Regions:
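Active-site entrance/lid segments in N-terminal catalytic domains of soluble metabolic enzymes
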Residues: 1-177
Length: 178
């Protein structure tokens, strides 16, 4: 462990200062952005805000609502492959929905079996969120690298980390979003 003694800022230290604008109304502001990811080479177009993959947040209902904006949803990792397959099957007529959803997984063998099954059933899945409580473990970094090797076409969201150094390491190991 290393102790940093330099000053750190928190949200309470940040002031968003407005500046002059040519916009006639705040309704004219366009938050939609387009990103091409480094490793998967896929392009995302939407508002870059994600609903977390928590049980009460990363739900099918949340995904259906956020796509209207368009925002992104990381589904709760406890959804079973059959549930995801059924849900995707019922929404096949909404191709934009699939480009705004990530299927979530952990890094255990059981998690790997579940995500493998899900990706076999739902071949149109574009995003996977690899989520652990401590993104600073070598085991997590190694898992991201193995997942990238196995699924080069998937856009990988990986975390949780808070430092630029580990975000960079995740991207070098194969993640697209860290």
């Amino acid at each position: 462990m290393r102790i940093d003694t330099d000053v750190k800022l928190d949200y309470s230290d940040v002031l968003l200062r407005p500046k002059r604008s040519t916009m006639g109304s705040r309704k004219d502001v366009d938050l939609v952005r387009e990103y091409t990811f480094r490793n998967s080479q896929k392009t995302y177009r939407g508002i870059p805000i994600m609903a977390a993959n928590m049980g009460g947040v990363g739900t099918f209902n949340m995904a259906e609502e956020l796509i209207k904006v368009p925002m992104f949803t990381c589904l709760d990792k406890n959804y079973q492959p059959a549930d995801i397959w059924d849900w995707f099957g019922n929404h096949v007529h909404k191709p934009d929905l699939q480009s705004h959803i990530a299927i979530s997984t952990g890094i255990t063998e059981v998690d790997q079996e579940r995500i493998d099954t899900t990706l076999k059933l739902c071949r149109s899945i574009e995003y996977v969120c690899i989520d652990v409580a401590n993104g600073y473990s070598e085991r997590f970094l190694d898992y991201v690298a193995r997942f990238r090797e196995k699924y080069p076409h998937i856009t990988i969201i990986a975390g949780n980390v808070v430092t630029a150094e580990l975000t960079e390491e995740l991207i070098l190991r194969g993640a697209d979003i860290g």
